[in-house]
């Protein structure tokens, strides 16, 4: 049953609070837990904001957080060597690779270098592949956050008609696979889809992750549908740039049954999922005999 008071808006704050409470309780129960290591390659201000948010949330639930800033000139080989050392370090619970990275760095190769049991972001190819087999224990954080918010509506996933607008490896494809694992019927729209609206107008749930401000309008949404807006865009405002999603929120909320705000929706839950993945990593590492 939904805990949301306003059925038009589906904020991330209560979901985030619940997940972080569960993480905190687990950390208190086990007593001692390894650290999360955040890797930033080069000094990117936007990345620094994400790292601060992650560090603050980790501190609040008692998970040690090590922020590492590597020089942007570091080589691919040195990066992979350092990651392998972390894989072998029992004091490292999980590894977070911040993006973007410099052009000379192959981000996929670094994601693949992170051991699946320390892949708290869920971006190792093995972690992505596990979703196909309905194993979503370490799913990509943003995708898992979107699923968590759909659950918050109280709707049963089984048989739900869902349209996923966007098919990125980080969000769109994992969301689609995770929803299929839950029994939903999923249609994925992308840049070659002839008409997004033709599909979205019949959907019970529309999830949007494209990176185009105000792409989805009220004429594209079925009355009463759930709209999960994952987009983050910066557009000019009267007092400077403002953050908006891929959905025309004010107009669409008059049609939709539930809609996530931007900011304050999926993004808030994403960091909580990262920390939930951390305790799942701890459970899996303990089951594998890595830690006691």
Swiss-Prot record:
GO annotation, biological process: L-histidine biosynthetic process; methionine biosynthetic process; purine nucleotide biosynthetic process; tetrahydrofolate interconversion
Keywords recorded for this protein, A-Z: Amino-acid biosynthesis, Histidine biosynthesis, Hydrolase, Methionine biosynthesis, Multifunctional enzyme, NADP, One-carbon metabolism, Oxidoreductase, Purine biosynthesis
Pfam families: THF_DHG_CYH (PF00763), THF_DHG_CYH_C (PF02882)
Pathway annotation from the record: One-carbon metabolism; tetrahydrofolate interconversion
Any Gene Ontology CC annotation: cytosol
Gene Ontology molecular function, alphabetical: methenyltetrahydrofolate cyclohydrolase activity; methylenetetrahydrofolate dehydrogenase (NADP+) activity
EC number(s) on file: 1.5.1.5, 3.5.4.9
Reaction equations catalysed: (6R)-5,10-methylene-5,6,7,8-tetrahydrofolate + NADP(+) = (6R)-5,10-methenyltetrahydrofolate + NADPH; (6R)-5,10-methenyltetrahydrofolate + H2O = (6R)-10-formyltetrahydrofolate + H(+)
The protein's role, per its UniProt record: Catalyzes the oxidation of 5,10-methylenetetrahydrofolate to 5,10-methenyltetrahydrofolate and then the hydrolysis of 5,10-methenyltetrahydrofolate to 10-formyltetrahydrofolate.
PANTHER family noted in UniProt: C-1-TETRAHYDROFOLATE SYNTHASE, CYTOPLASMIC, C-1-TETRAHYDROFOLATE SYNTHASE, CYTOPLASMIC-RELATED
Family named by the database record: Belongs to the tetrahydrofolate dehydrogenase/cyclohydrolase family.
Subunit structure of this chain's protein: Homodimer.
Name of the featured protein: Bifunctional protein FolD 2
UniProt lineage: Bacteria, Pseudomonadati, Pseudomonadota, Alphaproteobacteria, Rhodobacterales
Gene behind this protein: folD2
């Amino acid at each position: 049953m939904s805990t949301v008071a306003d059925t038009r808006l589906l904020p991330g704050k209560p979901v985030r609070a619940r997940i972080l409470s569960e993480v905190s309780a687990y950390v208190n129960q086990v007593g001692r837990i390894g650290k999360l290591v955040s890797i930033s390659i080069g000094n990117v201000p936007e990345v620094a904001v994400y790292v601060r948010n992650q560090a603050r949330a980790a501190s609040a639930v008692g998970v040690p957080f090590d922020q590492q800033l590597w020089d942007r000139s570091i080589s691919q080989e040195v990066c992979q060597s350092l990651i392998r050392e972390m894989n072998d370090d029992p004091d490292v619970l999980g590894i977070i690779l911040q993006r973007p990275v410099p052009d000379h760095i192959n981000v996929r190769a670094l994601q693949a270098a992170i051991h699946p049991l320390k892949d708290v972001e869920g971006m190792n190819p093995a972690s992505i592949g596990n979703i196909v087999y309905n194993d979503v224990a370490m799913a990509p954080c943003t995708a898992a956050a979107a699923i968590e918010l759909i659950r918050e509506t109280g709707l049963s996933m089984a048989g739900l008609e869902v349209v996923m607008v966007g098919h990125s490896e980080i969000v769109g494809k994992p969301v689609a696979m995770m929803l299929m694992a839950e029994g939903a019927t999923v249609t994925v729209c992308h840049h070659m889809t002839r008409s997004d609206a033709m599909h979205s107008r019949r959907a019970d749930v529309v999830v949007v992750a494209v990176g185009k401000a105000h792409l989805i309008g009220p004429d594209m949404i079925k009355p009463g549908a759930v709209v999960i807006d994952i987009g983050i865009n910066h557009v000019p405002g009267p007092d400077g740039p403002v953050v908006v999603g891929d959905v025309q929120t004010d107009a669409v909320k008059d049609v939709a049954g539930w809609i996530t705000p931007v900011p304050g929706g999926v993004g808030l839950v994403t960091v909580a999922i990262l920390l939930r993945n951390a305790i799942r990593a701890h459970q899996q590492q303990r089951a594998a005999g890595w830690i006691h």
